[in-house]
Amino acid sequence: IRDRNNASSILIQSWQRFRRLINNSINDDVFVNSRSMATDLHQVHLSDEVLNINGGEMMVVDIAGITEQLQCLVFGDIIRSVYSLKHGDFDPDERTSTKPVPKRIIIFVDELNKYAPSTSSKNSPLLANLLDITERGRSEGVVLFSAEQFRSAIHERIKGNCGTNVYGRTNAIEVSRPDYKFVPTVYANMMTRLKKGDLILHHPVFKTLLKIQFPFPSYNQGGSK
């Protein structure tokens, strides 16, 4: 019920939804500071795994099974752990690996617009970390590589600091947005008709856009041909 004497009051239903969201988040098992010792569960602390990553290794974090709010928290924790590793901001006993810290760490994230949308608040800690990577990460050996369905949905400063852009097939509505004003009409029309495996590359070293073809897999992926 809204207070008639206070136009800025919040509905009780809104408070209830907010309370439910907070309770579901803070009471989730992801916040339990312990892990099972059962070897078949393979439970680890993500921050410990990031701090012990070595050159040439790949770490995959599947967050599809948790809520969107928790996905942001997990992603933010990984980003902070990577920066702690590169800056040496960790206790010596936390890194058990005897190998040197990798000179370069590449972070690949799917659907970056979920974590740094164009409508993101300026006070978002996660956005601040992502902006730090895109603006200064290259000099510190941290590279952000992302894939998303709609480039226009990403925060402006992140797009502005992107050195290489690769475009796949998209729809006419997306191509008509301001993000594609620099794209010649012939290439814009081409983006709506690209075949699977065909891409358009944009990089400052080239004077024009380039159409490239992703190599066909050299092995049998199974399924119908």
Predicted regions and their residues:
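General structural signal for secondary-structure boundaries
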Residues: 23, 40-53, 171-173, 184-190, ...
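Short, acidic Gly/Pro/Ser/Thr-rich loop/turn segments
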Residues: 68, 208, 219
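Short, solvent-exposed amphipathic alpha-helical segments in soluble enzyme
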Residues: 75-79, 182-183, 217-218
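Charge-patterned, long linear interaction tracts outside catalytic cores
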Residues: 211-225
